[in-house]
C-alpha cells in the first residue's frame, strides 16, 4: 500500500474550502494526549517504588524520610517566624537552619540494622561453608579404594 493512500494522509490532504488548522490541532492534541497518558500509566508512584524495595532498604528509607520531614518542618517554622518580622530580608540575615544531619536515633538504628545484616551474612556464609564441607565429605566417602 502506498503512503499516499493511507487514511491519515488522506485526512490531512488539503481540500478546497476546508481549513487545515483544525486537523493539525486535532493531531497535536492526539500526540500530546497519548504521550501524557503513556507517562501517567507507565510511571510508578512513590508507594509502588517503596513497596518493591527489599526490607532493609525500605526500613532505612522510612527512617531517613522521617528525619527529612522533621528537618523540613523546623525549616518552615523558622521561615514563618522570620517572615512575621517587619524588617527587610537583607536585614534579617541568613536563616539559622543547620545542614541536614540525621538525629542520633536514626544513626543508632542504622548501626543496629547494619550489625544485624552483618550477623545474618556471617551466619549464611558459615552455613554455606558447612554445606560445602559436608558435600565434599560425602563425595570422599562415596569413592572406594579403587
From Swiss-Prot:
It comes from Yarrowia lipolytica (strain CLIB 122 / E 150). GO terms for cellular component: mitochondrial inner membrane; mitochondrial membrane. Keywords: Chaperone, Coiled coil, Membrane, Mitochondrion, Mitochondrion inner membrane, Transmembrane, Transmembrane helix. The keyword Transmembrane applies. Essential for the assembly of ubiquinol-cytochrome c reductase. It has a direct effect on the correct occurrence of the Rieske protein, core 4, core 5 and apocytochrome b. The chain crosses the membrane at residues 21-43. Belongs to the CBP4 family. One of its GO terms (biological process) is mitochondrial respiratory chain complex III assembly. Pfam families: CBP4. Residues 103-143 form a coiled coil. PANTHER family: ASSEMBLY FACTOR CBP4 (PTHR28202:SF1). It is found in: Mitochondrion inner membrane. This is Assembly factor CBP4. It is a single-pass membrane protein. InterPro entries: Cbp4.
